[in-house]
Amino acid sequence: MKKVLFSPINFAVVAGLMSLVGLTACTENSQQPTSQPNTAQTSAPTEVAKAPLKELTIAFATRRDTKDLQSKVDQVSAILSKEIGIPVKAVIGDETASVEALKADRANVAFLSGRAALKADTLAGSKMYLAEVRDDYSGGKTYDSIFVVPENSPLKTLADGTQTLEQLRGKRMAFTSRSSGSGFIFPVSELVGLKFVDGPDRLEQFFGKVTYGDGYSSALQAVLRDQADVAAVSEYALLPPWITAEEGKKLRVLHAVPNVPAHGIVIDDNVPADMREKLINAFLKLNEPENSELFRSLYNSTKLVKVDHEPHLAIMRTAIERAGLKP
């Protein structure tokens, strides 16, 4: 007797199963293409192309040690424009106005201090790419914040900062201003770090009297006129034009706080990467012999050097936080 491999019923069952498998496969194959576009639609682009700039605006900071600034920045702008291939417009203003201009896209580049650069980063996404180097900066691209006393002051520089600054308890203190990095932020950070004060609102609990000037000169003049026992300024403020050479001989450094980050060139994030590189290289042209005298006449800088935003400004950020302040 022959065995029947496929009865009508068995064949029908098998055929049905095969049809079901085929239907499932077809269904899966037909679904895959529709799922891919959905994924593509929900994925955000990693980088948005920036429109080419037709003109650059650079905000140059006002400084007391610079004369005829507009004429000089116009010459610098002409050099930069030639290098990058588009017009460069120069404007002059204080740091607050410069940061606001970056935020409002009225400026693409600014020359700022460390604290202002951090604020520009927060408000506008701008970063520092170049820092100045000066002969009167002891650290090259960093400088010292200093506590200054009269040459004949009984206050002495002792074995360490704690012993030295302990002598200031009850004394009359003159800060450069409430916004100065070297003349307020770093000195207060040092005092907080050494546990003499809890923050900027507790200074009167340590000092006998606290005053704030409108710049380095006014703070130093308070000491020279015996209106204060000590002043906090930048190390380069002991030189003209802040005070005369003769006045400088009547003062001395009691204590120094190092590594205040140098001022530098901040570029906004609305500048495309290729233009940013062109601009950085154009600024570095100011270091060359034919441009160095003009560049030095701006802010007494000897050259510009490349920096990484975060490492260069990290100590400023720490000082601000420790002093209980905001950028």
Model-identified regions with their sequence ranges:
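Short, polar/charged alpha-helical segment
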Residues: 42-45, 50-51, 55-58, 65-87, ...
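Periplasmic-binding protein-like
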Residues: 57, 61-62, 130-146, 204, ...
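A ligand-binding cleft/hinge motif common to bilobed small-molecule-binding domains
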Residues: 114-125, 187-193, 221-249
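A conserved helix-loop-strand patch within extracytoplasmic ligand-binding domains
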Residues: 133-184, 189-194
